[in-house]
Structures are given as structure tokens and as C-alpha cells.
Amino acid sequence: VIGGDECNINEHPFLVLVYYDDYQCGGTLINEEWVLTAAHCNGKNMEIYLGVHSKKVPNKDVQRRVPKEKFFCDSSKTYTKWNKDIMLIRLDRPVRKSAHIAPLSLPSSPPSVGSVCRVMGWGTITSPQETYPDVPHCAKINLLDYSECRAAYPGLPPKSRTLCAGVLEGGKDTCGGDSGGPLICNGQFQGIVSWGGDPCAQPHEPGSYTNVFDHLDWIKGIIAGNTDATCPL
């Protein structure tokens, strides 16, 4: 996260740290057995850590899990920059709630443009040179109209299942290593960090986030055991 500050140790009990291959992502615990992240965070040898704040000085209640099952909209190959960058992971065993571990509920109402949103993650705090922090950083950004992202990235289709968020003057943004983490607007879990400008946090180059609300039926269906649940087109 660029332009943020160290998160409060008690404000992110739902934030998970995902390692795969040699990369890292964020993710969000949505109940004791399920984590929501980005499809592009899929890889071999995935490890999921819950209850982390400082990587160097771990909390006593850190728990480690591996995926038992992974679910994608159609397949792990169909996501694009503007569609289906979402992955639901069933953990190998449920986690115990503790001081630094608790789920974040799914949104009860759709996102509204203009809301103030919070982003968080262990991603780089500088760009284009990368500096990875020991603790997660948090920043406030705004939910922007999708047209702002279309203006910045001409390849985007007229409509998509993504949210556009950032600050138009630049300086605050998610960045490499934050992918898969949550976008929390007006207290509700509305987006999953997907992609953005390179370098990060440039003026008029907001970030793109998978729209969680649009995928609720699919998420709830999979968790309920309906493996035929379909993603919105």
C-alpha cells in the first residue's frame, strides 16, 4: 500500500497473508473455513497465514493453513484484468477465532460511488522500486466512477464486474503484494485488490477491484456446497 500508514494491530483480524511459489498476496477470511482472494494469486505450494501483523515478530495466535479446495468462476485460466479475478479457498481445517483472527462479513448492500474505502496489505510501500514492509499498511481511498478507470486504461470494456478506486491526485494506492486483499467501503467488504497502474499511485490511474457484491450468489452457493454455482457473466 502506497501512501498509507502502519495498520492498527487490532483493525485487521480478517486479513490473511497468502504465500504461493515465491510471491505474496492478501486475502480475506469470510468465515472460519473460507478465504476470498484474487484468482491471479493462485499458485503451487500455497500457504495461508491468519492472525499476522508483524512478519518478524509473530503474534502468539498466528495460525497456518493450506487450501483444501480452490474455486474459480469458470476455471483458473478465465480471469482477465476486468473479469473474474476472484478465488474462493476452502481451508484444510477451520480456524479458531482469537485476539487477532475473526472473519469479515460479506456486504449487505451494493457499493456506492463516492464512498470512502480502506485498503490494507503487506505489499510494497514504494513504486516502482519495491520496499516490502514488516507490518501491513492501511490507506483511505475513494470509490470512483468506473469511467475514471476507462479513461485511464483504454482496453477496459464499457461495463465490468470491477470497481474503480483510488485518489485522482495520486499518492495513495494498493500495489504489488497487496493483490487479493480487501477494499472496505463504509465498513462493508466491497472489493478484492486486482490490478492497477504501473508504477502504482500515479495521478488519474486508479486501481481496479473485483466487485464482491456482484459475486455474492456464487460465493454463497459454493460455501453452501453447490459446486455448480455460476459466476455472473
UniProtKB/Swiss-Prot annotation:
Domain Peptidase S1: 1-224
PANTHER family assigned to the protein according to its UniProt record, in alphabetical order: KALLIKREIN-1 (PTHR24271:SF47), KALLIKREIN-RELATED (PTHR24271)
Top-level taxon of the source organism: Eukaryota
Main location: secreted
Family: Belongs to the peptidase S1 family. Snake venom subfamily.
Protein's UniProt name: Thrombin-like enzyme elegaxobin-1
UniProt GO BP: proteolysis; venom-mediated fibrinogenolysis in another organism; venom-mediated suppression of blood coagulation
Subcellular compartments: Secreted
Gene3D superfamilies on file: Trypsin-like serine proteases (2.40.10.10)
Quaternary assembly: Monomer.
Disulfide feature: 7-138, 25-41, 73-231, 117-185, 149-164, 175-200
UniProt-listed SMART domains: Tryp_SPc (SM00020)
GO MF annotations in UniProt: serine-type endopeptidase activity; toxin activity
Active site residues according to the UniProt entry: 40 (charge relay system), 85 (charge relay system), 179 (charge relay system)
Function, as annotated: Thrombin-like snake venom serine protease that clots rabbit fibrinogen. Only the beta chain of fibrinogen (FGB) is cleaved, releasing fibrinopeptide B. Incubation with human fibrinogen alpha and beta resulted in cleavage of both fibrinogen chains but generated neither fibrinopeptide A nor fibrinopeptide B. Promotes clotting of rabbit fibrinogen, but not bovine or human fibrinogen.
EC class: hydrolase
Organism: Protobothrops elegans
EC annotation from Swiss-Prot or TrEMBL: 3.4.21.-
Tissue note: Expressed by the venom gland.
Keywords per UniProt: Blood coagulation cascade activating toxin, Disulfide bond, Hemostasis impairing toxin, Hydrolase, Protease, Secreted, Serine protease, Toxin
A Pfam family annotated for this UniProt entry: Trypsin
